[in-house]
Swiss-Prot record:
InterPro entries: aa-tRNA-synth_I_CS (IPR001412), aa-tRNA-synth_Ia (IPR002300), Anticodon_Ile_BEm (IPR033708), Ile-tRNA-ligase (IPR002301), Ile-tRNA-ligase_type1 (IPR023585), Ile-tRNA_ligase (IPR050081), M/V/L/I-tRNA-synth_anticd-bd (IPR013155), Rossmann-like_a/b/a_fold (IPR014729). IleRS has two distinct active sites: one for aminoacylation and one for editing. The misactivated valine is translocated from the active site to the editing site, which sterically excludes the correctly activated isoleucine. The single editing site contains two valyl binding pockets, one specific for each substrate (Val-AMP or Val-tRNA(Ile)). Its EC number is 6.1.1.5. Transmembrane segments: none annotated. It comes from Shewanella sp. (strain W3-18-1). This is Isoleucine--tRNA ligase.
Length: 940
């Protein structure tokens, strides 16, 4: 055999079987950076139609987690696939750099501004800290194989971006959407600042739930409303609340106008009294109050009780009964304690009735000095004292501990309060912003489509947006207000542009350094500078304008796609929609795609305390970024994305299958020069034509899946092709022809041409997902080519070949099915020790007329398809008793061990082995391939 071994075309490639990704990927990254790969891609798409995916900026604080990786990898897959489709798809990563979390980190290091350090110095420290965080995160993102303008990202703290944020606010003002008001806002007493909706998390909390009686100022008159004359006992209206600390700010009792309310009399502790309760809640309430028997004196609608007055339980004034749509009978008494300074619904209904917006609570959550009974106490600690006072006054009907969902600060994880403070708001309704935003939502494509109804509900129900914060590190609200009237300066828009010009040169510190007289001249004494900063959600929400509209690589095209986690409907998607609609009357995006959160194998959130956190850095250092990228692509991101070590190891197994396929292709293209060896598709062996046609059809399916952002479909189709049509069928069949046919002969070159087309197509299919591996394959493909696959478009060499009808796709699928049945029977014969390998087998196929015609069409080449030394086709009716039934009703099989001699070169057992004297151990086919013109293959 040693003499003939060198006549075989054995596969050879530098592409290693083991990826060794953790070590090789960083080397590739160095080359990408050195070669300026991102700029090469940009240069290759000059003048093409833009596709703009705008990066939602992660916060510049801490290391990236697996959720960040999912987000960036999904974006990278889209950008690369759009580039492959011929678009000019720049990717400019960004970071959110202002705000409280950075302030808190810097405070730990240098103290609060105004203590050991000035506010200006504090801002500079914040800027330095954010820059350090950006650098750390940037390296981690680059390690994932994400291509972008990493050396020139956008930062919300860039002077130019800070200036453009101010300019965007001036447009919002110009459009009439900004107003100042005293309204209850989410307030964190630990932050000492208002919070945005997106900065609020809901966690379970135990609160005191109390039922409180408000005695009527005129009980006889109130009883008369229920048809009871000359009533002589006290009548009380009862509220239920879980925030006793808000009772000092109570200014009304809210009822539902259409709800039925009952006047219920009972005796307790020797005292007869009557309570007003929602009719449907009477039984549950009296059970809470341990009332065993009662009498319903009368019933009336809530509307009949409007403006009836009741005594505040411990303060010296009366409060009216008012009507509100927010009152329900889900819990409590059907009557709502109303404190306009401590609740959004309370505020809205209070405005209708002109109620005082009382706020006895300071920034730190402590009652102000003039608060009767509770001055100087923290509101949450005062709850017990409020309850004790109510008990003392005889107003407490019930008190229990109540577990419920309650808003918490996203940063401190502590309960927050609603608190009325003077703030700046973007109005939802004064100039039709809500209505227009809802129209724009309809014009946007939401992926998955449930995103539309989700954000619609949020926009329908959201309050005005409080955009002001009382912080140090943030973009200032650069306004001058009249000291007496609190009105904006009439030239606010032009003044803001002048301030923006200064910020563009000096950063936000320019505002605090500014002497009002520099801009206002003699008017300076009449106005004061606003010291509030913008909500950081305004910073990121305005980047469609402050960044995309400002950077030249976006060509003024506008944004095609926003892509973030599903929590961003109330976050970045919402803030961007509000600002863009306020500025321009339209949404800032055409498509919005959301992905689910990452959870562990048991569906639990990642948590350090549980110990189920999977850090992307650990994955890339152990398995490589391509494994992480494959997991992201293969997971349906529309729901929760499950990840664990076991799941990642399965991804590694799937990766190996793709890698092994690529290695087979490259190894068998050794010595192939497409410039001179490529066989035209129409001249190929039929099986080669078929596989090229399958690849062409698959490419269309893969491109469509990429276009629809269905990356799990891409990976499914790719794995199916590698495993079934290639691995189990085509590649298995062509090994014999590839290794044993004449090196330069048509049979082998036809096969290599098909492999070349598949490799050229496949390297592009995998490039958006398995970027490192695609680059590795690309460098080893034969033929003249550009330096990188990432500058290419989808492969154009796959012609959709029209096969003869007898060799249609269905025909080859039928042969694949037959081959699978033959393999089963051969495998059983192997287990029974009747044969060794499949080439020791002779197979007899008993087939019906239709199948017989199909099988005999390719003549003697059927044995190559079946990987047997001999294949005979006989009528199904002639099947012997030993014939094995198959899952195909039209086919029975007999497998026998060949009695013919084994060819030393191709290992086929053939009767003609030894018939040629010069090569006594070879079959005639091998002799032809060694010394003659090479065998002729027509079909397989």
């Amino acid at each position: 055999m040693s003499d003939y071994k060198f006549t075989l075309n054995l596969p050879e490639t530098e592409f290693p079987m083991r990826g060794n990704l953790a070590n090789r990927e960083p080397e590739m990254l160095e080359r990408w950076t050195k070669d300026g790969l991102y700029q090469q891609i940009r240069d290759s798409r000059i003048g093409r139609t833009p596709f703009i995916l705008h990066d939602g900026p992660p916060y510049a604080n801490g290391s990236i987690h697996i959720g960040h990786s999912v987000n960036k990898i999904l974006k990278d897959i889209i950008v690369k696939s759009k580039t492959m489709s011929g678009f000019d798809a720049p990717y400019v990563p960004g970071w959110d750099c202002h705000g409280l979390p950075i302030e808190l980190k810097v405070e730990q290091k240098v103290g609060k501004p105004g203590q050991k350090i000035t506010a200006a110095e504090f801002r500079e420290e914040c800027r330095k800290y954010a820059a350090e965080q950006v650098n750390g995160q940037r390296e981690d993102f680059i390690r994932l194989g994400v291509l972008g303008d990493w050396q020139n990202p956008y930062l919300t703290m860039d002077f130019s971006t800070e200036a453009n944020i101010v300019r965007s606010l001036s447009k919002v003002i110009e459009s009439g959407h900004l107003h100042k008001g005293v309204k209850p806002v989410h307030w964190c007493t630990d932050c000492g600042s208002a919070l945005a909706e997106a900065e609020v998390e809901y966690e379970d909390k135990t609160s005191p739930a109390i039922d409180v009686a408000f005695v009527a100022a005129d009980s006889k008159a109130v009883a008369a409303k229920f048809g009871v004359s000359d009533y002589s006992h006290p009548v009380s209206m009862v509220i239920w609340t879980t925030t006793p600390w808000t009772l000092p700010a109570n200014r009304a009792l809210s009822l539902s106008p259409e709800l039925d309310y009952s006047l219920v009399e009972f005796e307790k502790d020797g005292v007869t009294q009557a309570l007003i309760l929602a009719e449907v809640l009477v039984e549950s309430c009296l059970t809470r109050y341990n009332v065993e028997s009662h009498t319903v004196l009368g019933t009336t609608k809530g509307a009949a009780l409007e403006l009836v007055c009741f005594n505040h339980p411990f303060l010296d004034f009366d409060v009216p009964a008012i009507l509100g749509d927010h009152v329900t009978t889900d819990a409590g008494t059907g009557i709502v304690h109303t404190a306009p300074g401590h609740g959004q619904d309370d505020f809205v209904v209070g405005q209708k009735y002109g109620l005082e917006v009382a706020n006895p609570v300071g920034d730190n959550g402590v009652y102000k000095p003039d608060t009767k009974y509770f001055a100087g106490q923290h509101v949450f600690k005062a709850n017990d004292n409020v309850v004790a006072l109510l008990r003392e006054k005889g107003a407490l009907l019930n008190h229990v501990a109540y577990r419920h969902s309650y808003p918490h600060c996203w940063r401190h994880k502590t309960p927050i309060i609603f608190r009325a403070t003077p703030q700046w708001f973007i109005s939802m309704d004064n100039h039709g912003l809500r209505t227009q935003a809802l129209k724009e939502i309809e014009q946007t494509q939401w992926i998955p489509d449930w995103g539309q109804s989700r954000i619609e509900k949020m926009v329908e129900n959201r309050p005005d947006w409080c955009i002001s914060r009382q912080r140090t590190w943030g973009v200032p609200i650069t306004l001058f207000v009249n000291r007496e009237t609190e009105e904006l300066h009439p030239d606010s828009v032009s003044l803001m542009e002048r301030v923006a010009n200064r910020i563009e040169q000096q950063g936000i510190q320019a505002w605090w350094d500014l002497d009002a007289a520099e801009l206002l001249g003699d008017e300076a004494d009449q106005y004061r500078k606003v010291t509030d900063t913008l909500d950081v959600w305004y910073d990121s929400g305005s980047t469609f304008s402050s960044v995309v509209a400002a950077r030249p690589e976006f060509h003024g095209h506008g944004v095609d796609l926003y892509l973030e986690g599903s929590d961003q409907h109330r976050g970045w998607f919402m803030s961007s929609l509000m600002i863009s609609t306020a500025m321009n009357g339209k949404a800032p995006y055409k498509q919005v795609l959301t992905h689910g959160f990452t959870v562990d194998g048991k569906g639990r959130k990642m948590s350090k305390s549980i110990g189920n956190v999977i850090a992307p850095q650990t994955v890339t250092n152990k398995l490589g970024a391509d494994i992480l990228r494959l997991w992201v692509a293969a997971t349906d991101y529309s729901g929760e994305m499950t990840v664990s070590d076991e799941i990642l190891n399965r991804s590694a197994d799937a990766y190996r299958r793709i890698r092994n396929t690529a290695r087979f292709l490259l190894a068998n293209l050794n010595g192939f020069d497409p410039a001179k060896d490529l066989v035209a598709v129409e001249d190929m062996v039929a099986l080669d034509r078929w596989v090229v046609r399958r690849a062409a059809a698959l490419q269309q399916e893969i491109i469509e899946a990429y276009d629809q952002y269905n990356f799990h479909i891409v990976t499914q189709k790719l794995m199916q092709f590698c495993s079934v049509e290639l691995g189990s069928f085509y590649l298995d069949i062509i090994k014999d022809r590839q290794y044993t046919a004449k090196q330069e002969g048509h049979a082998r070159r036809s096969c290599q041409s098909a492999l070349f087309h598949i490799a050229e197509a496949m390297v592009r299919w995998i490039a958006p997902v398995l970027s490192f591996t695609a680059d590795e394959v690309w460098q080893l493909l034969p033929g003249e080519r550009d330096a990188y696959v990432f500058t290419q478009e989808w492969y154009q060499g796959l012609k959709s070949v029209t096969l003869a009808t007898d060799l249609s796709d269905d025909y080859w699928q039928q042969l694949l099915a037959v081959r699978n049945e033959v393999n089963k029977v051969i495998e059983q014969a192997r287990r029974d020790k009747r044969i060794g390998g499949s080439l020791e087998a002779e197979v007899t196929l008993f087939a019906d007329a239709t199948l017989t015609e199909q099988l005999t069409h390719i003549g003697d080449e059927l044995r190559f398809v079946l990987l047997t030394s001999e294949a005979k086709v006989l009528p199904l009716a002639d099947a012997t008793t030993e014939a094995v039934e198959t899952e195909l009703a039209s086919l029975k099989l007999v497998v026998a061990s060949s009695t013919a001699e084994k060819c030393e070169r191709c290992w086929h057992h053939r009767e003609e082995v030894g018939s040629i004297e010069a090569h006594p151990t070879l079959c005639t086919r091998c002799v032809t391939n060694i010394e003659g013109d090479g065998e002729v293959r027509q079909f397989a």
